[in-house]
């Protein structure tokens, strides 16, 4: 069985003191680079997709592609719903074979966040599907979820325990100063808050908004309990910039099989660096 749940992946990471990277994929080339690089480095990875990605590719198509590539490379993969907000949408994808879900109700008041998340957890656990939820909000935009910086807030450690116990989630995404998108300057991460959250919450912790973070910051968050690192914008930027550069240099290029190679090479550098930063090479 090559398409797996994230639950065992993250529990292994927690015990082993490393993190599993979750790469948001946007097209076939992104998927190829992530899987090929992970297989070559014998690293566990999570294939993540926002609602927009599943709409773009088609849920059945995406599931079939993940399954085929996992078998081709003899490498276990998890496919994960990132920042999904609608119960019916999640339920449909779970019934299609998805075994890892992030329900994002972090924009709701605390009690409503608990209620919405618990509804999803109760459904998903019937299918042995692991569930991640977020307490606190990151600034920036992820797919169609946008949070103004002024509205972003950090995770409260005491509330985090209540939230985890009331919902029954399998992992908790925390807000400690990261944001979706790339950073104009290095963010000031609240490491002491993260350490407190780890003391209050007995679950694998997840860091969103990791694109552009320094190796030092990533590794420090892992030491303090982060077991899953999300990367999206960094891959998109590498792909887009390499493609622009190639077509500027070779404006007559017309064959995507040729000009997409530069974009894949740029993404490969990102994926291999993130895997190294997470300390998960050789852990698959």
From Swiss-Prot:
Transmembrane segments: none annotated. Pathway: Carbohydrate metabolism; D-tagatose 6-phosphate degradation; D-glyceraldehyde 3-phosphate and glycerone phosphate from D-tagatose 6-phosphate: step 2/2. The keyword Zinc applies. One of its GO terms (cellular component) is cytosol. Binds 1 zinc ion per subunit. It catalyses: D-tagatofuranose 1,6-bisphosphate = D-glyceraldehyde 3-phosphate + dihydroxyacetone phosphate. Keywords: Galactitol metabolism, Lyase, Metal-binding, Zinc. InterPro entries: Aldolase_TIM, Class_II_FBP_aldolase, FBA_II, TagBP_ald_KbaY/GatY, TagBP_aldolase_GatY. It is an enzyme of class 4 (lyase). Its EC number is 4.1.2.40. Dihydroxyacetone phosphate binds at residues 181, 209-211, 230-233. The active site is at 82 (proton donor). GO terms for molecular function: tagatose-bisphosphate aldolase activity; zinc ion binding. Zn(2+) binds at residues 83, 180, 208. GO terms for biological process: D-tagatose 6-phosphate catabolic process; galactitol catabolic process. Pfam families: F_bP_aldolase (PF01116). Its cofactor is Zn(2+). NCBIfam families: cbbA, PRK09195.1, PRK12737.1, tag_bisphos_ald. Catalytic subunit of the tagatose-1,6-bisphosphate aldolase GatYZ, which catalyzes the reversible aldol condensation of dihydroxyacetone phosphate (DHAP or glycerone-phosphate) with glyceraldehyde 3-phosphate (G3P) to produce tagatose 1,6-bisphosphate (TBP). Requires GatZ subunit for full activity and stability. Is involved in the catabolism of galactitol. Belongs to the class II fructose-bisphosphate aldolase family. TagBP aldolase GatY subfamily. Forms a complex with GatZ. This is D-tagatose-1,6-bisphosphate aldolase subunit GatY.
